[in-house]
């Protein structure tokens, strides 16, 4: 009898050990790169502070927020699946991209006012906008190989098309629309940040409510498309509110021509500020909120209470002013040189 009992206990202990080992191995399988990427990003984000407050809060506080409409768990694992915080390839890629774009946009931002460089400048801005939108559409949907290659391919194609086939008036028209679209993104982030109740720093805003209430949050790509539509509508509203600046009927009006200089300086300063913010990110290990790979990402990476966001936006504003000042300085010097050329120079030659 004792022999049977010992045999039975040995069998139970062995099966339990085997079961535990199997569970451990299965858990290791599920800890893939995508889950690890999200885990590391979330642990380094301000949302971790919110989670900590929930864990250490009393039951009454937890009861108040646990019944809220929760759209995060359906999409947050995809939102930042490829990011600099947890992916070394992405960190090196964005750093090299920023290093390349910094001198290029500095040059066209200062010297791109001349007629022979206007097409190059506007095509470059259109290509960079295509890069931002492509990153937004592909990140969280495709793997890192496609996320790092396809946006560059799209941007290069748009640049070639703009330089070779597009008229200058067409480029100015869409440059103004790009400006309105980026302003719409900032307005959306500000309104979302102000209207939130503090339950989640990375808020989806109005696009998220439409996504969950009407479409029940089926596919993350649908949320991306809805967000682009919302930003496009806000952009059209801005154009309608300021027709003298953005309307197609006023492409050559004095106020539009003057404002175009500020628009170009503002847009050229974005990749410049991104490069400076990238250095700040690498040194301080914070999130670069204007990183092109997550610039349009929803939920937004811009958190107006974080040091990284305040630094990046401040640098962006400062670079916009500096680009405008240097651009006007170069243009004034160029006009002075032209005025000193004798009017009868062609006859003399």
From Swiss-Prot:
Membrane topology reported for the UniProt record: Multi-pass membrane protein
Coiled coil: none
Main location: membrane
Keyword tags: Cell membrane, Membrane, Signal, Transmembrane, Transmembrane helix
Observed effect of gene inactivation: Severe developmental defects in male gametocytogenesis leading to a reduction in the number of mature gametocytes. Impaired male gametocyte exflagellation. Female gametogenesis is normal. Defects in zygote-to-ookinete development. Severe reduction in the number of oocysts in the midgut of mosquitoes fed on mice infected with knockout parasites. Normal asexual development in host erythrocytes.
Cytoplasmic side: 113-117, 162-176, 240-262, 327-349
Position of the signal peptide: 1-18
Biotechnological relevance of this protein: Antibodies against G37/pbg37 partially reduce parasite transmission during the mosquito vector stage by preventing male gametocyte exflagellation and fertilization.
One GO location term (cellular component): plasma membrane
GO biological process, one term: male gamete generation
Residue spans crossing the bilayer: 92-112, 118-138, 141-161, 177-197, 219-239, 263-283, 306-326
Extracellular face of the membrane: 19-91, 139-140, 198-218, 284-305
Compartmental location: Cell membrane
Role: Involved in the development of male gametocytes.
Protein name in the entry: Sexual stage-specific protein G37
């Amino acid at each position: 009898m004792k022999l049977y009992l010992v045999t039975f206990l040995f069998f139970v202990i062995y099966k339990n050990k085997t079961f535990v080992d199997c569970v451990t191995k299965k858990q290791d399988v599920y800890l893939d790169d995508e889950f690890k990427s999200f885990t590391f990003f979330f642990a380094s984000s301000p949302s971790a502070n919110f989670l900590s407050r929930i864990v250490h809060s009393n039951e009454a506080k937890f009861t108040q927020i646990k019944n809220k409409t929760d759209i995060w768990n359906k999409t947050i694992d995809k939102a930042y699946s490829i990011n600099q915080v947890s992916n070394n390839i992405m960190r090196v890629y964005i750093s090299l991209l920023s290093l390349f774009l910094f001198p290029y946009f500095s040059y066209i931002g200062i010297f791109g006012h001349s007629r022979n460089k206007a097409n190059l400048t506007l095509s470059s801005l259109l290509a960079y906008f295509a890069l931002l939108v492509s990153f937004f559409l592909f990140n969280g949907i495709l793997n890192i190989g496609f996320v790092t290659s396809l946006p560059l391919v799209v941007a290069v194609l748009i640049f070639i098309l703009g330089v070779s086939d597009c008229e200058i008036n067409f480029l100015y028209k869409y440059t103004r629309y790009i400006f309105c679209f980026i302003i719409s993104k900032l307005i959306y982030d500000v309104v979302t940040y102000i209207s939130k109740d503090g339950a989640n720093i990375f808020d989806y805003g109005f696009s998220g409510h439409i996504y969950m209430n009407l479409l029940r949050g089926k596919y993350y790509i649908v949320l991306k498309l809805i967000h682009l539509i919302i930003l496009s509508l806000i952009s059209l509203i801005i154009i309608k509110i300021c027709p003298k600046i953005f309307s197609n009927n006023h492409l050559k009006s004095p106020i539009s021509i003057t404002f175009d200089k500020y628009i170009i300086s503002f847009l050229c300063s974005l990749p410049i500020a991104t490069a400076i913010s990238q250095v700040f990110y690498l040194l301080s290990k914070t999130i670069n909120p204007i990183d092109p790979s997550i610039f349009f990402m929803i939920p937004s990476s811009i958190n107006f209470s974080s040091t990284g966001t305040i630094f990046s936006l401040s640098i962006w504003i400062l670079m916009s002013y500096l680009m405008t000042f240097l651009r006007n300085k170069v243009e004034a010097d160029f006009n002075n040189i032209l005025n000193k050329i004798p009017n009868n120079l062609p006859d003399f030659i």
